Amino acid sequence: MKFDSIDTTISTLGPLKITSPIRRGENGALDRNFVHDTDRVLLDVELNNLLKMVEEGKDFSAFELAGPRSKIYFDPSKLRCALVTCGGLCPGLNDIIRAIVLELFFGYGMRNIYGFKYGLQGFIPKYRHDILDLKPKTVANLHEMGGSILGSSRGPQPIDEIVDSLERMNIGILFMVGGDGTLMAATKIANTITKRGLKVSVVGIPKTIDNDIYMVSRSIGFDTAGDVATQAIKSAHNESAGFPNGIGLI
C-alpha cells in the first residue's frame, strides 16, 4: 500500500489562544504530558519503504499524535458539545460515551454536553427525539451496560438539516461514533460546516464489529464480537458433534 499520496492534514478553526485547563503532574506544569502539533505517528513502518522515500526526497506520511494540547481554541466554560452513535450497535459504545463525558466534565470543566438520540435522526426536527443532558451521574455505571444509552439508527439524513440543528443549538464540537457510513456522513457534515464558515469541530470515532474501516488496524468492538461469536460457534459445534448427523445453527 502506498501512503505517500495520503493527505493526513487536520484543519484548525483558528489560532489556539486559550490555555488548556487540564492539570498534568503534581505541580500542575502546563508543559508536562502535552502533545505538540508537530508530533507524528508514521503510517508506514517498513524500513525499506522509508529508505526509498528518503532517496526520492519525499516526506513521511504520518498522522498527528493524539493527546491534549497546551493551547486550545474553544473556551470550555462556554462550549457546548454533542455526542451521537450511529449505525449498528457494537460492544464498547457506552464505554466511549462514558469516557468522553467524564473527560470533558472533569478534565476540561465543561458543563454543556448533550447526547442526540437515535443516530442522525436526533438532529432532524420531524422525528422529535429527546436530547439527553449528559452528566457524570448519568454515565457513572454506563460501562456495565451493553448497547448505547443514546440508541442508534441507520440510513442517511439531510446534511443541511443536521448542520442547521448544530447551528441552532450553538454546538462547538460534534462527536460521531460509528462505522464507515457514519464517518462518510461526518465528512459531509464537516464539509458543509466549512462552506458555511461555521466554527464547529467534527470528531469521528470509529467503531465496527466488521473491522473494515480504512487506515484503522483494529476498531472498537471487533475483538469482543469475535470472542463471543467464537464461543457460540464452539458450543454449536460441540452440541452437533455429539449426535449422528448433528447440525449446529448459529
Predicted features and spans:
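N-terminal low-complexity/intrinsically disordered extensions
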Residues: 1-79, 106-109, 141-142
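Glycine-rich oxoanion-binding loops at beta->alpha junctions
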Residues: 37-74, 122-172, 183, 220-227, ...
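Solvent-exposed alpha-helices and their adjacent loops that cap or buttress functional pockets
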Residues: 72-77, 82, 106-108, 140-144, ...
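Short glycine-rich or small-residue beta-strand-to-loop segments that form or flank ligand, phosphate
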Residues: 80-90, 148-151, 172-178, 204, ...
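Short Gly/Thr/Asp-enriched flexible loops that form oxyanion-binding sites at enzyme active sites
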Residues: 96-100, 181-197
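Short internal beta-strands
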Residues: 110-119, 204
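Short, acidic/small-residue loops that bind anionic groups at enzyme active sites
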Residues: 190-219, 223-230
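Polyanion-binding loop/helix "lid" in catalytic or ligand-binding cores
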Residues: 230-250
